[in-house]
């Protein structure tokens, strides 16, 4: 199990999230909200809602929690695989990958066959022909992997999806089959919304969970 960052920063259960991910994940990468909460990067350019949530999170986490967040790696590369929270071109800049042109830049920068990212909260899979360089967005929830392609995968978001589907999103990589599959898991959104409101966090953060955008 791998977590590509932003464990904290929007929700009302930051400490339990850190504990759960810490217990279960083999790899945890740093997201920009994690590092903002830990005081590693400034958050003055974040939107007002995000700033308020970060300030609240800083108050409720322990110094040990913040130390853990501050020491998370930005990127992990293993053989054909590159994992990062945002663009791998300069991970500390947390650049967004929103268009095929951005994906092409990523493939020109890295040598790996697979690149897995998060950051935009929008699940997407793009494959690029090794021979021609042609890219296409794959719409199926599960695809079989082929040697002739390179793959860019945005894994979406567990805690705040933004693709009009409020269910938690994750990706299953099966190296034996081999395949990549997007999984959606329902959870108690109302309970999460109630916690956010009870803690005095911006109501938009609660509303957004159901709006999923």
Residue ranges of model-derived segments:
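Core catalytic region of metal-dependent phosphoesterases/phosphodiesterases
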Residues: 1-66
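Acidic, His/Gly-rich catalytic cores of divalent-metal-dependent hydrolytic chemistry
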Residues: 130-213
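His/acidic metal-ligating clusters that form di-metal
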Residues: 60-128, 213
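Short, well-ordered secondary-structure micro-motifs
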Residues: 40-41, 94, 126-129, 193-195
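Active-site environment of divalent metal-dependent phosphoester hydrolases
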Residues: 9-11, 33-38, 89-91, 116-128, ...
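Short, glycine/charged-enriched secondary-structure capping and boundary segments
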Residues: 16-19, 42-45, 97-98, 129-132, ...
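Short, well-ordered alpha-helix to beta-strand connector turns
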Residues: 24-25, 72, 112, 149
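Active-site neighborhood of phospho(di)ester-bond hydrolases with catalytic His/Asp-centered motifs
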Residues: 1-6, 27-32, 84, 114-119, ...
């Amino acid at each position: 199990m791998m977590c590509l960052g932003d464990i904290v920063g929007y929700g009302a259960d930051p400490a339990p999230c850190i504990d759960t991910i810490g217990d279960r994940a083999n790899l945890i990468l740093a997201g920009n909200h994690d590092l903002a909460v830990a005081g590693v990067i400034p958050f003055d350019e974040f939107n007002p809602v995000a700033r308020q949530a970060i300030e609240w999170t800083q108050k409720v986490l322990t110094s040990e929690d913040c130390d853990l967040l501050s020491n998370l790696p930005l990127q992990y590369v293993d053989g054909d695989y590159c994992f990062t929270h945002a663009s791998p071109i300069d991970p500390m800049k947390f650049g967004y990958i929103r268009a095929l042109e951005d994906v092409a830049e990523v493939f020109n920068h890295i040598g790996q066959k697979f690149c897995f990212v998060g950051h935009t909260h929008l699940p997407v899979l793009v494959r690029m022909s090794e021979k021609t360089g042609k890219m296409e967005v794959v719409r199926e929830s599960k695809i079989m992997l082929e040697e002739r392609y390179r793959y860019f995968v945005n894994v979406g978001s567990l805690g705040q999806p933004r693709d009009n589907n409020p269910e938690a999103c994750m990706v299953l990589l099966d190296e034996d089959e081999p395949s990549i599959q997007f999984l959606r898991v329902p959870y108690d959104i109302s309970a999460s919304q109630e916690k956010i409101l009870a803690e005095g966090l911006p109501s938009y953060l609660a509303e957004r969970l159901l709006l999923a955008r």
